[in-house]
Amino acid sequence: MNFWTLLLPPIAGTVIGYFTNDIAINMLFRPYKAIYIGDRRLPFTPGLIPANQDRLARNISRIIMGSLLTPEEIQKLAQKLLQTERIEAAIRWLLQLAFAQIQGEQEQKTAGILAAILRDLASESLPRLIKVWSREDTFLEAQVYQIFDQLLLDFKLTEAQARQLTDWLLRTVLTPDILRQATIDFLTDKNIEIIDTSLREKTSGTYWVVANLFGVKNSLTRLRAFCLEEREIANARLQELILTLEIRLKLRLWLQGLSLQNLPVSTVRQLRKSFHQTIRQYFQNKGAGLMEYIGESVDWDNLSVVILRRLQASQVLDSSLGVVSQELSLLLDRYLEKDLEKIISQVIPILAIDQVIIERVNNTSPRELERAIQGIVKNELQAIVNLGGVLGFLVGVAQSVILLLN
């Protein structure tokens, strides 16, 4: 028997078995489009997969959603993705990105928004809130008491302050001319009569003798006349009395020793309570107007820029980003731990993954599908191709043996 007759079946079987997969794939996809002769379409055109690409897409989508991307698997993927460390890193990144935007081109826009918020808060919201809050008896109670206890109760004038205040009082309030005029205003006929009668009736001993024998009416009347008629001389006498009696020194020492701590405890408590009531009534009556005036007078635009730039340079802000990110991530983790399954069930219909798969397969051309499948076969299923060649070779050997035996 001819040697080539025995050798040809194994060779042919090997070639056919090795290239059968490529031929089968080509037969599934080609021709890519229908071929027409006249108005009649040739049978088996286009290929099996191009002709049924929509059905293939739906089957692929059903298989993936039913076996691979089940709600349970998506939930597991979400749990891996939404680990606390990853959430914290994402939140921190978002916060840093937000502050980077503030520091960049968005600074003026952010400052404008902040200025509008502060202006509305000071001019509109805060006045209404103060009007409501001030109706309560405890409005600013702790704050006012703290100011009273730590500031007013311990307040005392220093020696320099007492000296300055004394100089001002003697130069402006207690001048000789003002004292002379006050004496004239006080020594009216009625007041002189009252003083004279009181001294006659309520004194005793030597004072009674003086009051009843001599009286003070004439003396006080002459004093008033002296102050009226001898203005310059009266002022000079009063100035001499101020110097002789050391009024300046005594007034300075009195001011220097003036303190609320020298008052009785009951009086201090009453003053403390009255101070709070005065502050509360002021805010109740005029607090809204005060806040509106502040809201209109403050340059909120410049203030907002200053606040933002201060925040940008603040180390506290940088250190607090980590704490804020951690707290928000823990809060979100607790929420997701409880409601993740419910969220996934709501998200899947919204994402419409099955429709995405169908559209992606339908939008992929038959040529691209063929290349993808051939790439999978060559890269991942090469053993099947090799097995086809081996089986073809074995079949060819079997045929050669049969021919040899015959």
From Swiss-Prot:
Compartmental location: Cell inner membrane
Family: Belongs to the UPF0754 family.
Name of the protein this chain belongs to: UPF0754 membrane protein SYNPCC7002_A1087
Key word Cell membrane present: yes
Membrane topology classification: Single-pass membrane protein
Transmembrane segments annotated in the record for this chain: 384-404
GO cellular component entries: plasma membrane
Lineage: Bacteria, Bacillati, Cyanobacteriota, Cyanophyceae, Oscillatoriophycideae
Species whose genome carries this gene: Picosynechococcus sp. (strain ATCC 27264 / PCC 7002 / PR-6) (Agmenellum quadruplicatum)
Keyword Membrane: yes
Keywords associated with the record: Cell inner membrane, Cell membrane, Membrane, Transmembrane, Transmembrane helix
